[in-house]
A protein has these predicted regions:
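Nucleotide-state-sensitive switch-loop elements of NTP-binding domains
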Residues: 2-173
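C-terminal accessory "lid"/substrate-recognition subdomains
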Residues: 2-4, 48, 146, 152-356, ...
Length: 407
């Protein structure tokens, strides 16, 4: 598993997972079974004292002089410590003493910003990708508590776990980010979970990321080859991992994996606007069996705007996505034949690019597609063949004022 001569870049595994999932135990297990590899570790903890780094050191996994733990405390590597991360990874890569680097991020870090650090090129034209190669994104989840946490309406501040003032993220949003962007998901504490907890945990992971390899583990005992030097990470491909993205963009190769876990999905599409009150009622009612929903919507009272819907677990959010291209003067459109060709399928002679397009992903035995479609159809308004925004102005609209929000 050591680097070949043709691979001059230091391979890197990024280890993520919410606090309490047990990230440090698989890290220590891998380090104690690394088959002669010289491994450097960067450990990031949000506390003043880097507890995870101390656990790694006390375990004795890196006791040799040719290996090293780099501590990065009191900050999150996806934000405040990005510059420090760049410097440390570059220094370790240029040192040429290590076969591999493992970055254990804080439990409240999202993996995507960490991954983008490797493609970031500074003002001097230097990039981590010149000396290091992002090899595997690993997320560790707690098999016992995943369903409870995924169904929670808690914010990180409710758990006293934030990246600082202004961190208003919900717990489920962080879990979704960590799972959707992973190449490998370690389902830790599998032996402690009930059969039902384990089954639902697998199904949640498959519903969020049909590409991820799921590895069940106890006490973090993960084969090193499952998380080191896998060659799985591909930044552009990783952005298509989420199952909702595949559905909205017509990817069909995910079906066998999702069927194996009893997951099904569908896309609701329509070319008429929603009546705001009716759509708001739908948004605020339970959706049995739905694990994830994401997409775009059009309200009759807001003919120039695209709305975005995002649901995960018990939380549903709606927000302004931006202006419809139909509402933007053509002289401001991108001057690209490729862009125009890509947008052509979305344009209609009557409504332009205004449309409803929402993907629903859920448990095959619980999600009622027909009922969801019927409720959304009932929320539509307007004539099928006519764009009449003036006729819809009188409709009551309970959604926040998008005109006052920054674009």
């Amino acid at each position: 598993m050591a680097k070949t001569q043709s691979d001059n870049c230091l391979p890197v595994t990024v280890l993520s997972g919410f606090l309490g999932a047990g990230k440090t135990t698989p890290l220590n297990h891998v380090l104690n079974n690394r088959e002669g590899m010289k491994v450097a570790v960067i450990v990031n903890d949000m506390s003043e004292v880097n507890i995870d780094a101390e656990l790694v050191k006390q375990d004795g996994a890196l006791s040799r002089t040719d290996e090293k733990v780099v501590e990065m405390s009191n900050g999150c590597i996806c934000c405040t410590l990005r510059d420090d991360l760049l410097k440390e990874v570059r220094r370790l890569a240029e040192d040429k003493r290590f076969d591999y680097l493992v970055i254990e991020s804080t439990g409240i870090a999202e993996p995507l910003p960490v991954a983008t650090t490797f493609d970031f090129r500074d003002e001097d034209g230097q990039s981590l990708s010149d000396v290091a190669r992002l090899d595997t994104m690993v997320t560790v989840v707690d098999a016992v508590n995943l369903l409870k946490d995924y169904s929670s309406q808690d914010f990180l501040r409710d758990r006293a776990k934030t990246a600082g003032d202004g961190d208003d993220r919900a717990l489920v949003d962080l879990l979704v980010e960590q799972i959707e962007f992973a190449d490998v998901v370690v389902l830790n504490k599998a032996g402690t979970a009930t059969r039902e907890q384990l089954d639902l945990a697998r199904r949640i992971i498959a519903a969020l990321n049909s590409e991820a390899r799921i590895i069940e583990a106890d006490y973090g005992r993960v084969p090193p080859g499952a998380v080191l030097d896998t060659g799985l990470s591909d930044f552009e491909r990783a952005q298509t991992h989420p199952l909702w993205f595949k559905e909205l963009n017509g990817f069909m190769d995910h079906m066998p994996e999702t069927e194996e876990y009893g997951i099904r999905s569908f896309v609701y599409r329509a070319r008429r606007p929603f009546a705001p009150m009716a759509f708001n009622a739908f948004v605020n009612k339970p959706w049995p069996g739905v694990i994830r929903a994401k997409g775009f919507f059009w309200l009759a009272t807001r003919p120039n705007f695209v709305g975005e819907l995002a649901q995960a677990g018990a939380l549903v959010r709606t927000s302004k996505r931006g202006l419809c291209w139909s509402a933007v003067p053509r002289e401001r459109w991108p001057d690209s034949a490729e862009w125009r060709a890509s947008m052509e399928p979305y344009f209609d002679n009557t409504f332009g690019d205004r449309r409803q397009e929402i993907v629903f992903i859920g448990l095959a035995d619980q999600m009622d597609e027909a009922a969801i479609r019927a409720e959304l159809d009932a929320a539509l308004t307007g004539m099928v063949d006519r764009f009449t925004p003036d006729a819809w102005k009188h409709l009551l609209d309970p959604f926040p004022n998008w005109e006052q929000q920054a674009a």
